[in-house]
Amino acid sequence: MKSFFLYLYVAFMFSCITALPLPVDNKRASSDSLDLKKKYAPDPPITHNVNIGIVFTDPESSEEAGRLITIDLYGTMVPKTVMTFCQYVDSVKDRLASRHSYSPERDFDKILPNGAIEGSSVSSSSIEETEMLAPKLPEENHSLIHDRPGRVSMIKDDKGLKFIIETSETPLEGESVVFGQVTAGLKDLMDKLANVKTDENGKPEQPITIGYISSQEHRIQHAKEAHEKYLQRLQDYQNGDLEKGITLKNYLYQGSQRKLEDAKYNQLHHPLPKIMLGISVLLLFYVLAKYRKRIFNRSSKIVSIRED
């Protein structure tokens, strides 16, 4: 009797362990680490939205996957950088719309140790040529900082300009200009894309490409007034009025529909019902094994009363 309950306990613990998600200690980034109540400084007026469909190899299933993210751009703060990124978006649109839309090249070159995702060159210009073109990073506005996951910034290297998407609060080394924020799909970005398999230099083992891209410009009628209101909200926040700040809660998903789909999935795939079903089956076998003589003896004692 005692040995049976010991086996039952071991089976229960094994089911619980296998049903739990994998630990995230070895992940570069994880949305589980986010404090969804934390207030960050307000964002500037939005001048553009960019939707990017990213195709990559899922680090858990090793199958090809696609995720859609939305990036808000802040043209009232860094107009030159935003203009350069929009030109890059247009070039990718043209590439995807052409007959030879398939491209074996990588649209994302590297995953940094802190989980930041480095895009390929925005311009193919050399560093000398880039010096004569907008944006000149040292002359741009640097008041936006890398203080939250989802920040999008532009850097310069010997290959020209590149954009980087942050997945943590760790500041970037070197000079960069923050020009946008991921405002939808941040969860997939942190949990999936930032944790793809890479070599020792951070290069993804399988190419990460852009399968879809679109952009929309928001024409602000009173841009100067909107920017001044933002500066006032920012000043209030810096003076201690945290109500003027924002959280990242709404940035994790692609919208309420996505949240609903996730909720339905979790209800259907939650491990607890499976665990309880397994325990119920074990208990049923136990009852049958213990009381089998009584159960089967009763059935054998049934006598026919039919008259000959």
UniProtKB/Swiss-Prot annotation:
It comes from Saccharomyces cerevisiae (strain ATCC 204508 / S288c) (Baker's yeast). This is Peptidyl-prolyl cis-trans isomerase CYP8. Residues 56-215 form the PPIase cyclophilin-type domain. One of its GO terms (molecular function) is cyclosporin A binding. PPIases accelerate the folding of proteins. It catalyzes the cis-trans isomerization of proline imidic peptide bonds in oligopeptides. It catalyses: [protein]-peptidylproline (omega=180) = [protein]-peptidylproline (omega=0). Gene3D superfamilies: Cyclophilin-like. GO terms for biological process: protein folding. It is an enzyme of class 5 (isomerase). Pfam families: Pro_isomerase. GO terms for cellular component: cytoplasm; endoplasmic reticulum; fungal-type vacuole.
